[in-house]
From Swiss-Prot:
GO molecular function: identical protein binding
Positions glycosylated per UniProt: N36, N70, N116, N350
One Pfam family cited in the UniProt record for this chain: S-layer
Gene Ontology BP, a term: cell wall organization
Subcellular location: Secreted, Cell wall, S-layer; Cell membrane
Organism domain of life: Archaea
Function according to Swiss-Prot or TrEMBL: S-layer protein. The S-layer is a paracrystalline mono-layered assembly of proteins which coat the surface of the cell.
Mod. after translation: Glycosylated.
Chief location of this protein within or outside the cell: secreted
UniProt biased composition (Acidic residues): 613-622, 634-643
Name under which the protein is recorded: Major S-layer protein
Length: 671
């Protein structure tokens, strides 16, 4: 029995530790243009032509776009059909359309058979039509790369989604390589590729398969081998040029298919059109699915105001590019949060703070002072909006597409990153810790149910910062809030760095529990002061005027064609590969979900590497993640707990495990 007790206690201790660990649910939102008016008719009149309003990849950053070829395939339109009024789109008035287009391979080499391929955006993902003239049979594009890879005899190159190629043999003398293509470890095809011939096309292996959605001779993989050579130890093949589709998960779209709220499917050759058979309501203060991960986000406004945007939610780990509206030509350009999805925006309060302008272009050169980034402090509502409890508004300032809080609400020179602004409910037991992100945490030192109090302790990287006993018995709702004020934050005193609102304390089945609703936190430990001589990438002329920060370029800034040029602090211009008579570019930032994935490093021809485990995914680029706290066990029925995703292991599981150990003990004793 002592042994069982020890095991049970160990299990309890282990699970208590795990219960305190945070588990962030990371989401990237890529939004389209912001539409603001009195009702849907007013918006169609203002932003459309009075009959129809259309967005495409040049202004909706989620849609597929090829800047070099200036290729878009997708549009989303709202048409003023009957019953389109107020906040309602009538039947057939919400129209998603996509058309097959030709784009160049990343490894562009027409002599080797690498010129163009057919592509179609499908709900903001890149798909390949199995038949290049018909839009009904699609397979997702996994890989289109011109990076160099080296692969040794017996080595495998992971292509993603379970696909791989292996170098079975590398014959340096014969200038050949034997490659094998597999899916989930199962053989698919193999080929001996010769690189000795003058015919560059012979260096390419096209894997063609039959019966892909009833289509034959479908190219599913293209591999171009540059050369084979003898390394210090191994025989090595160098690959430059990889293209792959996910043929194992190809699909055929039927006329009776449904995609979210889009359920009227029409296929006309190379064009796919899907509309709504039923009316579509833009419900205020809500997100309504359009289809396949596309949504409309609608602001919490009175009935005489309608404000919304289309957006794509991404939850898969990886790196993603969030771009602004595409600029074309040599005229002046400007972006704000309505035209650059990377900039900070609060749809409910219609608050944006950042602008980026380009003026007086000379060809592709921006003169001194012609590139200007400006941001101004604005007030927004707390997510937990409760003015009676001291939760009304706080000052915010976008800073290079990140959300920052001014230490002094009237001055833009001292800022700290916003870590958390949440109205979710969390339960926390005596001795339990709630991870707030970035090393910050709060712990319930004691929960006094009879006295209706909770003793909370605030820590940073495990070190004590402050503590407070919060009473929830008073009728004064503001007394339920703990404001942690610290001094000497960038030479400022009485700075509120954390706000916690405690709803109630109650007795659970075993533990005393406090319920928190309302959390707000800034990263004060990494606050910064912006000086007039600071430099931010190519922006180095800093001007601070009260609540406004302006940074411009002291030197000329060249929009070099076919390149990416840093603006500052992770913000870039992407410039198309065009002729000198044309100029096309957009600003972008990169966001990351999960652990940051390092980019591919090209292997110089003279020094090939043995690393071949890297895989190039589609449209993924580095990004920042805002961590959110983990919720504990749901409260009793009378208290609603939100955000079921990302919860910590519940105590029900813990006691279930202890019960299981008890059963094991009793069975063994009886035996």
């Amino acid at each position: 029995m002592k042994r069982f007790a020890a095991l049970s206690l160990a299990a309890l201790m282990l699970l208590t530790v795990f219960a305190s660990a945070a588990s962030a649910v990371d989401v990237i939102e890529i939004r389209g243009p912001v539409y603001n008016g009195s009702d849907i008719d007013d918006i169609i009149d203002t932003y459309g032509d009075g009959t129809i309003l259309t967005m495409d990849a040049t202004d909706f950053a989620a849609f597929y776009y090829d800047i070099d070829d200036n290729v878009t395939t997708e549009t989303l339109s709202i048409e003023d059909v009957p019953d389109t009024e107020g906040n309602v789109i009538g039947e057939g008035g919400l129209i998603y359309e996509t058309t097959i287009q030709e784009v160049e391979y990343e490894y562009y080499n027409p002599d080797a058979g690498w010129d163009n391929y057919s592509l179609m955006g499908f709900f903001a993902e890149k798909y390949i039509p199995i038949n290049p003239d018909k839009a009904d049979k699609l397979s997702k594009l996994i890989l289109d790369s011109d990076d160099k890879y080296t692969i040794r005899t017996g080595e495998m190159l992971d292509l993603g989604e379970g696909y791989a190629i292996e170098a079975k043999q590398v014959d340096v003398d014969g200038e050949k390589v034997w490659l094998e293509f597999t899916k989930d470890g199962e053989f698919v095809d193999d080929e001996i590729i010769s690189v000795s011939t003058a015919d560059d096309e012979a260096n390419t292996w096209d894997v063609e398969l039959d019966d892909i959605e009833d289509e034959d001779d479908v190219i599913v993989l293209k591999v171009h081998v540059n050369q084979v050579f003898q390394g210090a130890v191994d025989s090595i093949a160098q690959i430059e040029g990889l293209w792959l589709i996910d043929y194992a998960n190809a699909m055929t779209i039927e006329s009776d298919d449904e995609f979210g709220n889009l359920d009227d499917v029409s296929i006309d050759g190379d064009t796919l059109t899907i509309t709504n058979e039923d009316t579509f309501t833009l419900t205020r203060d809500d997100e309504e699915e359009i289809g396949e991960g596309l949504y409309f986000a609608t602001a919490d406004t009175p009935s005489n105001v309608l404000r919304f945007y289309a957006m794509k939610e991404i939850t898969d780990p990886g790196t993603y590019e969030i771009r602004g509206q595409v600029a074309s030509g040599f005229g002046d350009q400007s972006w704000d949060a309505s035209s650059f999805a990377g900039f900070y925006y609060d749809i409910d309060d219609n608050v944006s703070t950042e602008t980026l302008t380009v003026s007086d272009l000379d060809g592709n050169v921006i003169p001194e002072g012609g590139l200007v980034y400006t941001t101004t402090i604005a007030d927004v509502d707390f997510e937990y909006y409760n003015p009676d409890a001291g939760w009304d508004q706080y000052p915010v300032m976008g800073f290079f597409a990140e959300e920052y809080i001014p230490i002094n609400p009237d001055k833009a020179d001292k800022i700290a990153k916003l870590v958390l602004d949440s109205d979710d409910k969390y339960t926390i037991r005596t001795g339990e810790m709630l991870d707030l992100g970035e090393g910050y945490a709060i712990e319930a030192k004691q929960v006094d149910v009879d006295g209706e109090k909770v003793w909370l302790e605030f820590t940073k990287d495990g070190e004590f910062v402050d503590d407070e006993i919060i009473s929830v018995s008073t009728a004064d709702d503001e007394a339920n809030t703990w404001d942690v004020e610290l001094d000497d934050i960038e030479d400022e005193d009485d700075v509120v760095v954390l706000k916690v609102h405690v709803n109630q304390v109650f007795q659970g089945a075993v533990d005393s529990i406090a319920q928190i609703e309302g959390l707000w936190l800034i990263d004060y430990a990494n606050a910064m002061t912006i000086e007039s001589d600071d430099e931010f990438g190519n922006l180095d002329d800093v001007s601070i005027d009260g609540d406004t920060l302006k940074i411009s370029n002291e030197d000329t800034f060249t929009l070099t064609r076919d390149s990416e040029e840093e603006i500052g602090e992770g913000m870039y211009f992407m410039i198309a590969d065009t002729s000198s008579s044309d100029l096309r570019y957009y600003p972008y930032v990169e966001k990351t979900i999960g652990e940051e994935v390092s980019g591919e490093e090209e292997t110089p021809e003279e020094t090939p590497t043995g690393e071949v485990t890297e895989t190039e995914g589609e449209e993924e680029t580095p990004t920042e993640v805002t961590e959110t706290p983990t919720e504990g066990e749901p409260a009793p029925e009378e208290t609603e707990t939100t955000e079921s995703e990302g919860t910590t292991p519940g105590f029900g599981f813990m006691f279930g495990l202890v019960g299981l150990l008890a059963v094991v003990y009793l069975v063994r004793r009886n035996n």
